[in-house]
């Protein structure tokens, strides 16, 4: 410290060395407009100990002709060796720092005024800011090192000086007169505390005005987690089960809390805004946002939980970016621990990410700390964001929700429901997803790769491609209290137990998960790539004459305008031909010209990738496609028959695709679709019977192409039932049936030349079997073997006969029958060998 001559000499050398690089100025000429009485002692107060900050203040005082902080100052009969002090005391020689203590210089000054007859002393708060205000800075590199609210280490301070030192700003604030405070007559100790409090509030308000608000709750929250009763209980149990000391268990809990907690930083939020503004404009052609007013309507007085669909890694940042740009607080975002990589993890954490392990199983202490952290966010009103699908969807479908985070949220609300929780679904639709090539490999069966920091460099190569637009639709909010009122009307009066785990929690959480998934799908952004993929993948060779493709796209648009999927869903502008031109400009379509015109098709690579974009909106077209399917093998069908078989099949389509309509609403919605199909001349109505067009007509082709949108889904349903019926009662477990379905689907895809790996996706069969169990069509015995209702075969054949062509049904039955024959041959060979 420059309190003595030899130290002042060293300080002077340091200041001259510093100013070989640093350039500083006062904010609003504040050093020149100070109204100080030079006949009375003047001392400067800085918030934190920093020699570099002091050197800058000393330089600005010299430039303005003010008393220098490093020079002695007379205080009555005494001499202070330097005219400055730090609000936070300097650390001792062991590096320890008493943040609650008062500066000895301030104590002496106050005593001189209050007890020793000194007329007055003037305290001038001074703040040093390295670099411009985050709101004014446009360099992402400088924003990354800009002043923030976190305590700065020496290396970071050095980096800040080197990067931001050319634009250093100093704010001199109006002097505080100690005489005015002493005359309030509160006594020495209380006046000392009051001065400290005034200075703390002053520095905080000034810092907020210059660098933005302190968005971080980390410094106080992390230690507070360990004082929570449920965490204390978990620490005690950890001590007993692991036979470790209380101190060690607390250290483990503190390590978990630091691993989890986010560390919001306003400069980093600005840094990400600058980077992402460039990114969206460079890679994507902007972001289209719909229904954001729904968030603005519920933001006041509610705890907001954003639940986006998960298609890409950039989903993490996209929502925060949009909310920040629209004047809403960015949320705390749940991110997988695999993203806590060097450098990137730190940026994400300061951008609002909190990190969670993939599994909490068997670690009660981690579970308690994580649950308490999330409860603290909710109870304090911090908006949050997590992905109910868990991971990114590699197929483009809405993945079946994972209920872990929803269960934690629900339990937190049961624990403290004073602040209402509102879920806001956010549908994110890409015309070309950044990880498309990676997904292509995984769709073809490649092993899922672990994320790495080096994956970021792959983005550079993608910048040359055209990625179109990003669509972000905010769905209809779900009010948790209203949801509970519907499903557990007396939830507020129940004894929920010390851990808030009522018996109905799992079932209610599952219902909530399905509601969230349906609301997400309700907000689908239907874009040109989705529609073109849907149309071309419905053909046998993924190819259509350009005029025919334009007609079917016009049909899709007309149908969706006549029967909108939901008030939250959006459609692209333009007609079919405009959509084709747009998709061609993205190099997603190949073309071949001949004398009759132009044929547009998907090459092998784009055909597989197109399944991803088709699946984004398959739920939107599933019901009209199911209706059209009834006319593949039937020239006419009565409304009564159509409704009966549609009701039989719909629950499975709804469960797989999270379609919005309940079974009670189904008849009315089908009537709307039938009317729309009649209006487009795809069907003709005679009394209560609907008749398809002549097979040679253009309308018939359009109807069949629409039907084929769900053909593969219906084939998978029929496949599982055929294998189950062939095996007989109590012959297969659910896992065995799932494996058989996968093998059978692979064989059929080879036999029929299907280039669609998701056709034999194991998870789709697993969820179909689970739906059969949920609807009590199947039952498990004590050994886990499956039995089925006696009428299952009759119902399955009756429905399949009406929605699947005869050759497909025959092919599935033949492959299903081959399995018993193969097993019999294997048993015969084993017997002969013995």
From Swiss-Prot:
CDD domains: LPLAT_DHAPAT-like. A motif (HXXXXD motif) lies at residues 310-315. Pathway: Phospholipid metabolism; CDP-diacylglycerol biosynthesis; CDP-diacylglycerol from sn-glycerol 3-phosphate: step 1/3. Keywords: Acyltransferase, Cell inner membrane, Cell membrane, Lipid biosynthesis, Lipid metabolism, Membrane, Phospholipid biosynthesis, Phospholipid metabolism, Transferase. Pfam families: Acyltransferase (PF01553), GPAT_C (PF19277). GO terms for cellular component: plasma membrane. It catalyses: sn-glycerol 3-phosphate + an acyl-CoA = a 1-acyl-sn-glycero-3-phosphate + CoA. Its main location: membrane. It is found in: Cell inner membrane. One of its GO terms (biological process) is phospholipid biosynthetic process. Belongs to the GPAT/DAPAT family. PANTHER family: DIHYDROXYACETONE PHOSPHATE ACYLTRANSFERASE, GLYCEROL-3-PHOSPHATE ACYLTRANSFERASE. The HXXXXD motif is essential for acyltransferase activity and may constitute the binding site for the phosphate moiety of the glycerol-3-phosphate. This is Glycerol-3-phosphate acyltransferase. It comes from Pseudomonas aeruginosa (strain ATCC 15692 / DSM 22644 / CIP 104116 / JCM 14847 / LMG 12228 / 1C / PRS 101 / PAO1). The gene is plsB.
